[in-house]
Amino acid sequence: MARLKEIYKKEIAPKLLKDLELKNPMEIPRITKITLNMGVGEALADKKVLENAVSDLEKIAGQKAVVTRARKSIAGFKVREGWPIGCKVTLRSDRMYEFLDRLISISIPRIRDFRGISPKQFDGRGNFSMGVSEQIIFPEIDYDKIDKLRGLDICISTTARNNDEGRALLKAFNFPFKG
């Protein structure tokens, strides 16, 4: 079992039950999935760029990435429906907790000029999204072997009912919020 999963079950869940004044243990907020998304607009001109992005995302997640395709044509961006424009990975269960552990303890501290994550990045329903401007903050990526610095989106989906519950959950996991 992943280290953070054990910590959640033994320490975080009972603490949240008491702090949020919940009556039923099934109401305790938990993380359901983590989605990593990398939009690769340059893939329209060069297919090799998308292959490199997919391999980077697979190294970061430890799981196979899925190529995302354009849902509709947009003439302004010179995109046709069905063209590959990015890649994504959805992590659940043990892999999700292992990724979250690496993100909190290793990757986030490696962000340049890092002063804490803004607590305003919640969506109103307890889900948290953040952008990472460089994939080299992850230890799995070798700086000498990448072709270009690319950013990615990290979305953490929770069962929290509002932003306060979601923030309390992530703060219990030692997420480095500002203030």
From Swiss-Prot:
CC per GO annotation: ribonucleoprotein complex; ribosome
The protein's name in its UniProt record: Large ribosomal subunit protein uL5
Biological process annotations from GO: translation
Protein family (similarity comment): Belongs to the universal ribosomal protein uL5 family.
Quaternary assembly: Part of the 50S ribosomal subunit; part of the 5S rRNA/L5/L18/L25 subcomplex. Contacts the 5S rRNA and the P site tRNA. Forms a bridge to the 30S subunit in the 70S ribosome.
One Pfam family in the UniProt entry: Ribosomal_L5_C
GO molecular function, one term: tRNA binding
Keyword Disulfide bond: no
HAMAP family attached to this UniProt entry: Ribosomal_uL5_B
Function comment: This is one of the proteins that bind and probably mediate the attachment of the 5S RNA into the large ribosomal subunit, where it forms part of the central protuberance. In the 70S ribosome it contacts protein S13 of the 30S subunit (bridge B1b), connecting the 2 subunits; this bridge is implicated in subunit movement. Contacts the P site tRNA; the 5S rRNA and some of its associated proteins might help stabilize positioning of ribosome-bound tRNAs.
Assigned keywords, A-Z: Ribonucleoprotein, Ribosomal protein, RNA-binding, rRNA-binding, tRNA-binding
InterPro entries: Ribosomal_uL5, Ribosomal_uL5_bac-type, Ribosomal_uL5_C, Ribosomal_uL5_CS, Ribosomal_uL5_dom_sf, Ribosomal_uL5_N
Gene transcribed to yield this protein: rplE
